[in-house]
Amino acid sequence: MDTKKEQERDELHRAIWAIADDLRGSVDGWDFKSYVLGFMFYRYISENLTNYINKGEHAAGNTDFDYIALSDEEAEFAREDLVNEKGFFIKPSELFGNIRKKAPNDDNLNETLEKVFRHIEESAQGADSEDDFAGLFDDIDVNSNKLGGTVIKRNERLVKIINGVGDLQLGDYQDNTIDAFGDAYEFLMGMYASNAGKSGGEYFTPQEVSELLTRIAVAGKTEVNKVYDTACGSGSLLLKAAKVLGKDAVRQGFYGQEINITTYNLCRINMFLHDIDYDKFNIANEDTLINPQHWDDEPFEAIVSNPPYSIKWEGDDNPVLINDPRFSPAGVLAPKSKADLAFVMHALSWLATNGTAAIVCFPGIMYRGGAEKKIRKYLVDNNFIDAIIQLPDNLFYGTSIATCIMVLKKSKSENSTLYIDASKEFIKVTNNNKLTDENIEKIVSTCYERTETEYFSKLVPNDAIAEEDYNLSVSTYVEQEDTSEKIDITELNAQIAEIVAKENTLRAEIDKIIKEIEG
C-alpha cells in the first residue's frame, strides 16, 4: 500500500469532514452536498483554467505571468480561444481565489456569486460545450433560507463554505499521488449517501461495487471505445473505467442518462472534477426507458449500471413501446410495476457485439413469473447471459437487500451461463458490508476465466436452465456448503451407554448409603 497516498487521502478526508461538521445543523447533509460540491467545482475550474493559461505563458517565456492578477479587460482577448479549448471562460475578477479574498467584506456576496455562476454558464453558450455547462450551478441556491433567515446570515454561511473549500489541500500534493478533487468528491458523496440512507443510494454506488462492475465489464481489454451507464446517478460508476483502464483508454469518452436534474448536475460536475474534458463526456437528462438518448451512437463496448430497483414505468400503457426495437425482440414488456428488465433490455440493445454489460439487479427478476419469465427465456435462449453473480446483502446505502449482477454478452463461445455465489465475500464495516480487494479479485477472475469451484461457482448449460423453467437464481445451481456439525451415531450411542452405566452405578451407591442410614 502506498503510505504517502493513504496519508494524503486521510488528511483530505479529515478536512472535508471538518467543513461538514462546522456546518452541521444549518444545512442538513443531503441538501448541503450541493453547496460543498458546487463550490468545489467552482474552485476546480478556476484553478484548472488559471493553471492552463499560466503554463502556456510560462512556456512562452513570460515566467512572471499569473492569470489571477490580470485585469478583466486584458483577459477578454483570450475568451474565444479559451472557450474553444477548455469549453468555458472565467474573468480574473470572478475566479474563486479573487472572490474568496473579497467575500468577507462583500455585503452582496449572494448576488455576486449568482452573477459569477451565470457568467460561467453563459460563456459556453453557442459553443460545443454549451450542453455540458447549461444549468450546472442551478442547485447552488445562494438565496435559500436553508443557509439562514436573513441575507447577512446567508452570506456568513457562504463565506464559511467558501473558506472551507478554499482551505482544502487539493492542489499542493507532489507527483499527483492522489486524484485530489475527484477523491474529495467521492468521499463527500459516500459520506452524504451513507447518512441520507435510501435517498443517498439513488445517487451513489459504493466504490467497491463500482470497481467490481467495471472490472467485469472491461475484463480482457486494455481499451474500449466508450463506457455507458443507463441510469448514471452522480457518475461515480461511469468514472471507474477511467481509474481501471486509464481515461485515455476510453477512447471516445463517457456516456450516460439520468432522469433526476439534481443528480444530472452532480454527474456533470463529477466529470469535470475528474479532469474529463467537456468533449469526452455526454450525459443526458432524460427518461432512459421512454426517451432514450444516444440512439445514433456507435454501440458501447462497456456498459455498467445500477438502475433503480423495481420502479414503475409506462410499460404496456404506452402502445409505442412494444414496437420499440429495444424491447420488441422479447415479445413482451417488463411489468408496469417493475421496470428492472426494461433496463436490462435497453442495455443489451446499446451493447456492442464485442462488448460486456454488468448490471446490478433486484433478485426478484431472477425467478418471478409472467412477463419477466418470458424476457428471461428470450435472454437465455439467445445466449445473451454470460453470468449471474449473487452479491452479499447490505452492500448498498439505503437497502439491505442482497442484489445480483447480470453480465450480458452478444458473442459468447459456448451455450452456458456461469453462476457465482459471492454472498459470503465481504467484511463487515460499521452498518454495511463491504467487498475487499481480495473478494473483488476472486469474483472477477472466476467470471473471466469461467472456472468452477465447489460451493462458489458453476457453469450451467442453457438447456439445463430451460429445464428449471428459466429460473436464474444462483441458489438453484450453486450448491450450498453444509456447515452443520457432522454427528457420528455410533460414537454418540457409545457415549450414551457410558453415561447410563455411570448413572446406574451412582444409583446403586446412593441406595446403599440410604439403607445404611435407615439401618
Question: Could you say what each language-model-derived stretch is?
Answer:
Residues 19, 183, 240, 255, ...:
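Residues within well-formed alpha-helices
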Residues 1-212, 216-217, 221, 279-291, ...:
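Non-catalytic, mostly N-terminal accessory regions of nucleic-acid modification and defense proteins
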Residues 34, 197, 229-231, 252, ...:
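Short glycine- and Lys/Arg-enriched binding-loop motifs that mark or flank ligand-binding interfaces
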